[in-house]
Amino acid sequence: MRQGTLHFFLFFGLIFGFTTLSLAQHSVARKWNEATLLAIRNDFARPTVHARNLFHTSVAMYDAWAAYDLTAQTFFLGKKIGNFTCNYIGIPTNFNVPAAREEAISYAMYRLLNHRFKGSPGASKTLPYIDSLFVALGYDGSFTSSNYSAGSAAALGNYIAQQLIAFGLQDGSNERNSYANTFYQPVNSPLVTKFAGNNMENPNRWQPLSLDVFIDQSGNVIPINTPLFLSPEWGNVTPFSLKSQDLTIFTRDNNQYWVYHDPGTPPQLSPDGSGTSAAYQWNFDLVSCWSAHLDPRDGVMWDISPGGIGNTGTLPKTFEEYKDFYKVVQGGVTQTGHPINPSTGKPYAPQMVPRGDYTRVLAEFWADGPSSETPPGHWFSIANYVADHPAHQRKFKGQGEELTSLEWDVKTYFILGGAMHDAAVTAWGIKGWYDYVRPVSAIRYMGTKGQSSDNKLSHFSAQGMQLVPGLIETVQPADTLSWAKGGDLGKVKVRAWRGPNYIPNPATTYAGVGWILAEGWWPYQRPTFVSPPFAGLISGHSTFSRTGAEVLTMLTGDAYFPGGMGEFVAKKNEYLKFEEGPSMDVIMQWATYRDASDQSSLSRIWGGIHPPADDIPGRMIGEKIGKAAFAFGEQYFSKTSTPTRDGLSDFQNMAVKVYPNPISSSTNQIKLEIPTTHPVLQFELINQQGAKLRTWKMDVDQFQAGFSLHEGGRLTPGVYYLRITGDGEQLTKKVVIVE
C-alpha cells in the first residue's frame, strides 16, 4: 500500500471464506455486514431488493445496539414505520452491555439473513457461511424464543428479526410473491439484439431485450431470454426518510406510480422532430460517440490522477449547459482536477494511461457484476475500507471523541442503508413512471430511421441521428467495408466499439473501435446481458453514488478519502472481463467521495447504458437524498431530539389520488380520492414561487365529486402544488396543467 492512499476492492469474484481475517479484527456489525454483502454477491442482481436488504439489516443491527444505549433511540423498536407498528416494552440493562449487544445483533442478523436468502441461487454458499459465522461467534441456532421481557439479548435479536420480516411482507415490495410486478406492462415489443435494426413502437419508452441466453449481473443464468423490467413499482415501497412533500402520485392505466423528487419528462423524440427531439438525438448520439473512446490503440493518453480529473463544478441544468458540460468528441466533462493532496500538502503525481484503457476499466469497475454486491453494496464496501484505513479516525462528522468500532459501524450502516434504500425507492419510482428508453434501443432505432442533419441526403428522417464528422456519418460508395455496398449505401454508420462479434475469446482478444452500421450498435457489455432489465431515467448508478458520496462526506466530516486519495489497481491483461485488457496497469484514483461518484456516473455513458439525460438528474437527486437521509438519521443518535418523521405519512399511506393529472387547461373538474375520516379538509393551490392562489374547504362528498382549479380565473400551463390539510395533518400533491 502506498503511503497516503487507500486501496479498496469491491470484491469481484470473491471466494467463499473471505472474512477469516476479519473475524479477529472487526466489530460484530462489520462481520455481519460482510456476510450480507457475500449473500448479495451470490444472489440475483437486484439493486432495489438489495438496497432494501442492506437497509433492513442495518436497522436490525442499529436497533439491537441502540436498545442498550442511554443516549440513542431506536428506529424500529417501539415505533411506527409506514403502516407497521413494532411494539416494544424495553429491556433491562443491568448486565454486560457489550456482550448483550453482540448477541442481539448476531441473532437478529442470523434470522433475517436466513429468511431473505434461503431461496437465493447461491444459498449453498451463503447459508453455510452464515451458519459458520454464527457458530464461530459462540451462539446457539436452536434458541428461537422472541420473549425478550426477561432480558434475553438472543430473544431480543430474534424479536427484531421477526418484526422486520413481518414489516417486509407489507411494505409495498411484494416480497411475499418474490418481488413480482403487479401491474406494469411494457409498451414495446422486445428487441432481438443479435439482429440489426429496430422498429419499436415508441422510441421514448423502455424496450425489453431478447437474448440468446440471459446472464444477470451476478453471473446467474436466467431461464428466460427476455428479462422482465425489474421493480417498476418500487416507488410504492415504504422509504426511510423520503417526504410526502417530495411525492407525486401519477396514474397510468388506472395504476398508481409513486414518484419522489420528480425530475420531469426527459427529452422525447417526435415523429416530425419537434419539441425536445434535438435534445433526445444529442443525448443518444453522445453515447454512440463516446463508444469510440474504447480502443487503447487510438494514441490518446489521459492523466487520470486526481490532478488531471475530478473536482467537477456546477452541474448543468439546461440543454445548452449540457452541451458545454459534456465533451462529445474527446470525451469526459468539464472538470479542473485537484492541484494539491490536502493530506500530504503535495501535488498528485500524474498518471498517464491510454484513454481506451481508462474508459474500459471505468465501465467494468462500476458495473453491477458479475459477482457484484450491486451499486448500493459498492458504497458499503467503500465505507468499510474507509473505516479500515490507518489514517481514518472514527469521529462522527469528524468531531468529538473517537467512537468504538461497533458504534461507528452501526451508525454508518444505519444512515448509509437508509440512504441507499431511499435512493432505490426514488430512482426506480422514476424509472417505472417515465419508462425511458435505453441507448441500445434508441441508437438502433434512430440508425434504422436514418440521419436528421440534411434533408438533401438520402435516408433522411426527422427521427434519425445527427451527423458528427468522423463519428456519425453516412455510408458512401468509396467505403471499403464488407457491409458498405448495395442496400447499405446512404445508411448511418458510426465509429464505435465494434461489439461482441469481434471478440472470439474475451481472455485474449478485444473488439477495438471501427465503423459499424448504427442499426447494429452495441453497448460495451457482454452479449448475454447488453443492458440492465429496467428503464434508463434516472441512472441508478448516479443516484446511488451521489447519495453514498454525500453520506460519507458528512459522516467523516471530510470530502476527501483518508490520506487524500482512494485507489484501485486494474492489472494489465487481467482485470477486464468483457474482453482482453487493459494494455497496461491502470490505477483508478479518487481524491474525494464525490470524485468517485462522478466517475461512477460517467462509467455508465462509456458503458453504453445511459445518456447524460439519465445521469445529471440522478446526481442532483442523489445529493438531495444523501443530505436529507443523513439529517434524518442522525436525529436517532440522541434521545433529546425528536426525529422529524414525515408528518404527512398518514395521508401518504392512504394513497391519495388526484385525477386527471396532468390536467388540461380547458378541463373544469379535478377529483380526489382520499380514504379519510376527516369531516372537512382544506385545499390550497400554490404556484412554484410559493404564492397561494386558491383556498377551498370541502367535505368528502364535495371533493370526490370534483371541483374546478380555475375558479377565479384560468390558470396558465405549468406546475402547481395542491396542499391538503385535515386535523393537523398535511399532504402536498404536485398538479401539472398542460395546454
Go through each PLM region and give its residues.
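C-terminal outer-membrane/trafficking sorting elements
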Residues: 15-20, 649-659, 664-739
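Hydrophobic alpha-helical segments, especially transmembrane helices
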Residues: 3, 8, 53, 542, ...
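Generic low-complexity segments that are intrinsically disordered, proline-rich and/or Lys/Arg-biased
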Residues: 1-4, 8, 240, 340, ...
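Acidic/polar surface patches and capping/hinge elements
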Residues: 25-645
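Bacterial Sec-dependent N-terminal signal peptides
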Residues: 1-27
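Short, intrinsically disordered/low-complexity patches at protein termini
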Residues: 3, 14-16, 463, 568-570, ...
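Generic alpha-helix initiation/capping and coil-helix boundary signal
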Residues: 10, 15-17, 150, 376, ...
